[in-house]
Amino acid sequence: MNILRALCLAAMSFAFSQSAFALEALQVSERQPGNLESWVALSILITSVLTAWFLNQNAPKVRVFGTILAASGCFAIAAWFLFYVLGTGFLENPKPNQTPLDSAKPALLWIQAMVALVSGVALLAVAFKQSKNTEILELSATNEPDRYGRVSRVLHWTIAILFLALIPMGIFASIIPEGTSYRVEYYVVHKTLGVIVLALVLVRLFWNTKSKRPALDASLTSKERKLAHVAHIALYVMMIMIPITGFIMTSFHGAPTFFFAWELEPLWGFSKTGTIVWGMLHKYLLPYLLYIVLGAHILGALKHQLIDKHTIAFKRMVS
């Protein structure tokens, strides 16, 4: 109830706040020369794909390298926050809040940085344990009755890694004060990766029609099966809707959508009402729902592995 009350309050504040219409009016002339932000987006994409690929290779040493890469990515997020974001002073002096929920963004960044740091340490421990394993992973490209195939796994982990990079980046970009020289660059990377995530999710859905998903583990209770099914659908809906609502919000505000060095012009004219409605969805409602569902998804997977000892369920997607 507290969450619903907060979201309703945010919606009212957003609707009546004059500053809400200064969302992100990004102009072509504001971009820095050299397209550095496009190279950053490309490097994040390549690193994410390679990490997902190495994590699901046959050779155990290659999988260890993939786990180390994943740990390095977590440490990179934590280091970016601790050594860069904190130094900007934007957590103490952000862009003026549009809703009461904006005041929670510094705390969210702190939480995500600490989670990334702890996850990096945990992944290094996993890599050390993996290094003692000599088992060859016999994994086909297509899904099997009891586990996902290599294509599904690579898509799953690529999308997951990109989303974990998108979330803190999007939060930080939204608190950067207007007029900051590199504000646009953050939006270029954020929007580019958002378009890619949407494309990969659609590819994943198409692949599911060609290669049947494995059945849920038999050890799960009826309630757990229903929760897993609902969470799975909710994650797909949000992974599709968050990029789409972001594009619609940006278009209604009259700003371009960036994809590497290209700029996609708005498909329709400026609308205050459209900016409010779609901005509320993209910046508040869907992200906070994503935090809840994604957190439940991760905690549920860890519960099956560490508490219930349902190792088969965990290995459906993890090598």
Describe the role of every protein-language-model region:
Residues M1-E24:
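N-terminal secretory/membrane targeting signals
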Residues A22-S319:
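Membrane-embedded alpha-helical bundles that constitute the cytochrome b-like, heme-associated redox core
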